[in-house]
A protein has these predicted regions:
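Short loop/turn segments that connect beta-strands within beta-propeller blades
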Residues: 145-148, 192-196, 232-236, 278-281, ...
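Blade/loop signatures of beta-propeller domains
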Residues: 44-63, 69-106
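Structural signature of WD-repeat beta-propellers
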Residues: 136-137, 167, 176, 183-184, ...
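Bacterial signal peptide processing site
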Residues: 23-26
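Extracytoplasmic beta-rich repeat domains
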Residues: 106-126, 154-173, 200-215, 238-260, ...
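C-terminal motif of bacterial Sec signal peptides marking the signal peptidase cleavage site
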Residues: 18-21
Length: 358
């Protein structure tokens, strides 16, 4: 046998072994492949009624048949004379406010600029001290007469960096004869409510985002990178700050912290809900209103886009990703949870909670 013939035989034997090995690997891989197509008449195919869609595991808010006959009873309506914070009171619990119908438009007035590609109106008007205070898309603050909408004063809050003109977020709050405002830039200002004159300005490293809450001699507002500032109302000094988990994906809303006594409850874009001591910012408890398994990219955003609400010893909060929960204010114990998500603060009236889901 020549060397050439021996080489050919060795090559053929090697190819045969290799093909056999490939066939074996292919057979093994086929048994492990979860996406292998199974014919309908395959005896090993599971019955059709045993196939469960993964969508069936998605939880959603369902009506309880046992509660269908429960009467919805609201507390006695009262006449509210002030709306000094973005969500009414510092606790955000407005209960059952009185209004005699039918409601008619008292006046209609255009003022300032609207939203555009570089700025957006996220701030809500407030009412205090017999005046309406509002902000336009440029960050101008207006004081208006509630009887006819006539302008009392107008103030332009200028960003020191002229190149930084883009702003999203903002809000106003009133306390002690002052209007506390930010327009989505790197500062929060205190204005004299009577004249609009700027009293002081507190600066931050990143733009403010959440609407301010002003109560108890302090102003609370958080920034785009989830850092909460507590600022002295009298002089604008930063008393303390709390850094939440940074989260770049958030919604264009302006929630505000809820405050009751010495407890501050802060919502963050990461889905965190943190209770802090108003004196020093020390954490009392925290929880995460996060939910995985969203079917779309936007459903995975965990932002607590609406303000939390404090009623007595309970806290109610809802994240965009689909968690509505009630907590004990003192301990942070989660009392109950429902699969509901939205952009707005829940409204509590008596023993009932009203909300709009997304």
């Amino acid at each position: 046998m020549t060397f050439e013939t021996s080489a050919r035989l060795i090559l053929l034997a090697s190819l045969g072994t290799l093909l056999a090995a490939c066939s074996s690997i292919q057979d093994t891989a086929s048994t492990l492949n979860p996406f292998t197509i199974i014919e309908e008449d395959d005896p090993n195919a599971p019955p059709v009624d045993e196939r469960v869609s993964i969508l069936s595991f998605e939880q959603s808010l369902q009506a309880d048949p046992e509660a269908a006959a429960l009467p919805v009873e609201l507390p006695t309506a009262y006449r509210n004379t002030i709306w000094a914070q973005p969500d009414g009171y510092p606790t955000h619990a407005m209960q059952h406010t009185q209004a005699s119908g039918p409601l008619d438009i008292l006046f209609r007035r255009n003022f300032g600029n609207g939203s555009n590609r570089s700025s957006r109106i996220n701030s809500r008007p407030i009412y205090a001290d017999g005046r309406i205070y509002a902000m336009d898309g440029r960050g101008y603050v207006f004081a208006l007469d509630p009887e006819n909408g006539s302008e009392i004063w107008e103030v332009a809050l200028r960003e020191p960096n002229r190149n930084d003109r883009t702003s999203f977020g903002g809000g106003l709050a009133f306390d002690g004869g002052r209007v506390f405002v930010h327009n989505g830039h790197r500062f929060l200002a205190a204005l004299d409510a009577a004249t609009g004159q700027e009293i002081w300005r507190a600066e931050s490293l990143t733009p403010f985002h959440s609407a301010p809450t002003a109560v108890g001699g302090m102003v609370y507002a958080s920034t785009d990178d989830n850092e909460l500032y507590a600022i002295d109302q009298s002089n604008g000094e930063i008393v303390w700050n709390h850094q939440g988990i940074a989260e770049p994906a958030r919604l264009l809303t302006s929630p505000s912290v809820a405050v009751l006594g010495e407890t501050v409850v802060a919502p963050y874009a990461s889905g965190e809900l943190v209770a802090l001591r108003s004196q020093n910012g020390n954490p009392i408890w925290n929880d995460a209103l996060t939910r995985s398994g969203g079917l779309t990219p936007i459903s995975a955003i965990n932002d607590v886009a609406g303000s939390p609400v404090i009623v007595d010893d309970m806290v109610y909060a809802m994240s965009h990703s689909g968690i509505l929960a009630a907590f004990n204010l003192r301990t942070g114990e989660r009392i109950w949870t429902q699969p509901a998500g939205g952009l707005h603060a829940p409204w509590v009236a008596g023993n009932f909670l009203f909300l709009v889901t997304s």
